[in-house]
Swiss-Prot record:
GO terms for molecular function: 2-isopropylmalate synthase activity; acetyl-CoA C-acetyltransferase activity; manganese ion binding. It catalyses: 3-methyl-2-oxobutanoate + acetyl-CoA + H2O = (2S)-2-isopropylmalate + CoA + H(+). It comes from Variovorax paradoxus (strain S110). Homodimer. This is 2-isopropylmalate synthase. GO terms for biological process: L-leucine biosynthetic process. Its cofactor is Mn(2+). Belongs to the alpha-IPM synthase/homocitrate synthase family. LeuA type 1 subfamily. It is found in: Cytoplasm. Signal peptide: none annotated. PROSITE patterns: AIPM_HOMOCIT_SYNTH_1 (PS00815), AIPM_HOMOCIT_SYNTH_2 (PS00816), PYR_CT (PS50991).
Amino acid sequence: MTDQLIIFDTTLRDGEQSPGASMTRDEKMRIAKQLERLKVDVIEAGFPASSNGDFEAVKAIADIIKESTVCGLSRANDRDISRAAEALKGAARGRIHTFIATSPLHMEKKLRMSPDEVHEQAKLAVRFARNLVSDVEFSPEDGYRSDPDFLCRVLETVINEGATTINVPDTVGYAIPELYGNFIKMLRERVPNSDKAIWSVHCHNDLGMAVANSLAGVKIGGARQVECTINGLGERAGNCSLEEVVMAVKTRRDYFGLDLNIDTTHIVAASRMVSQTTGFVVQPNKAVVGANAFAHASGIHQDGVLKARDTYEIMRAEDVGWAANKIVLGKLSGRNAFKQRLQELGVTMASEADINAAFLRFKELADRKSEIFDEDILALVSAEEHSNVDEQFAFVSLSQHSETGERPQAKVVFTVQGKEVTGESDGNGPVDASLKAIESHVKSGAEMVLYSVNAISGSTESQGEVTVRLQNAGRVVNGVGADPDIVVASAKAYLSALNKLQSQAEKVAAQG
């Protein structure tokens, strides 16, 4: 008889706290639908009280997600909790996740509250939340660095008040696997009513041990929920990686003895979607989802894999969604083949009209490059979905002129709220000239803090995927653009970032 391990994904909340990872409502909705296809148990959709934008995103996700539980974060006060409950009204299954810091450092320096005041506020918050929804999660922020006696007292109280999940975060990534696992075990043994709640772990990766700590919390501590993000996305060094913890539990079922609801064949599609949406490129040697995760360069290894895959592979690439063949389509491919490939990649589009529009973009791309890879398809689908969103700025065309020894000239045509405009400029290279051409009309005043180019596939005619990170008035956003022409991709990425600067609202800080 095995136990069930609940996977709680917080890509849309804690993951979004990475500088530049801010997502629009429509982007969050697309990722939420992918998480539902992945069969994630709980989707933490955002922090409704932090901004009107986050409230609307959580509300929209609650309305469209039918299989997964949709969770909203709140601080331990009536206003935040009420706001979360309001956003979750349309959810088939809704959860309020409320938190307050319990470590001496946080209580004294941040909250300026006594332990008794924190205890009382936690009690009242869970009581209030439990009157609004049946599923309430409580987190003692910086729980791992809290006094065990005080923490046990708080956790016993909130369980008595109706908390159904107790999440113990290692907020600053300070824990060591064995110590963290024993810490969870100690809490479960010392809290008299611990059996009345599901115990959860939430680990940050500051020392590179978020996955190891989470697994120790499960194996040693007896936790039955893991909080994680796609690609390990998160502020500072990131969070526990969903794909790594899931595949560890699945691959080593002999050791963990746990069941999962996750459909692992959608992992790679989810990873690519999050990467392309946020602009956070997945490193090639990233476990499970990196481009080299199933690559073998050593002749000895290659020989072994050809003879028997299990000589050097502990899991199958196709089990996590990697395609067996990379080159799948070309300019002679028809709409049905394109649609079939979308289904194989785990991509679901809203309507036949959207598929038709994406297919037209595919045919345009196929006229420009002979081999179309899965990565190309995902990039153009992502671009098509973005083009359907009401945006202030949209790319139309670009022309440039450059000769050796002279400053390049660029002219960029784009729309501003549907009206076509033209910007022209010279620059210290074609990319610089093109972005200055856009700025000559927009005059955003934003500072570029990152510019990076990633080849989507491995040939010289590959599409370039450009990430641009802009900072303005304390806000940081990423824009992503893809095109076989790097200069065009750069202009698209810059306009994408400008759109996010226009739409992003200020937010209240959440827990780490």
